[in-house]
Amino acid sequence: MEVIHKIGRRKTAVARVYVSEGKGNITVNKKDLKDYFTTGTLLYKVNQPMMLTENEGNFDVKINVYGGGITGQAEAIRLALSRAMVALDEENHGALKPEGLLTRDPRMVERKKYGQKKARKKFQFSKR
């Protein structure tokens, strides 16, 4: 089996995932997965595509991720891993699509407007 390369994005985070046959080692930016993502919810998000397709421990995954915050990075990795699982076996599509793991979340941060404090918040208004 050759190495499968897929890209996932979320907000401003970009994740590049390289999946190859192995013993289940997952490295993120040359660190172990548990060292990079310390909270349980983020670890669950990253492992979700592997759990749903029952491929935990079957593949070695090398991940390069940059940009955004820690949650955006975890969700970018989840999308890239989901795409890689579908590339490995088309039958995985049926398990991942209902969970919404193959859909790129289009929500981005709304820009700040001039004449306002933030994107939607206005400066204090004084009637008199």
UniProtKB/Swiss-Prot annotation:
Gene from which the chain derives: rpsI
Pfam families the UniProt entry points to: Ribosomal_S9
GO cellular component, one term: cytosolic small ribosomal subunit
Organism classification: Bacteria, Pseudomonadati, Bacteroidota, Flavobacteriia, Flavobacteriales
Keyword Chaperone among record annotations: no
Gene Ontology MF annotations: RNA binding; structural constituent of ribosome
Keywords recorded for this protein, A-Z: Ribonucleoprotein, Ribosomal protein
The family this protein is said to belong to: Belongs to the universal ribosomal protein uS9 family.
InterPro entries to which the protein is assigned, alphabetical: Ribosomal_Su5_D2-typ_SF, Ribosomal_uS9, Ribosomal_uS9_bac/plastid, Ribsml_uS5_D2-typ_fold_subgr
Gene Ontology terms: biological process: translation
Annotated source species: Christiangramia forsetii (strain DSM 17595 / CGMCC 1.15422 / KT0803) (Gramella forsetii)
UniProt protein name: Small ribosomal subunit protein uS9
Keyword set includes Ribosomal protein: yes
Tree of life domain: Bacteria
Disulfide bonds: none
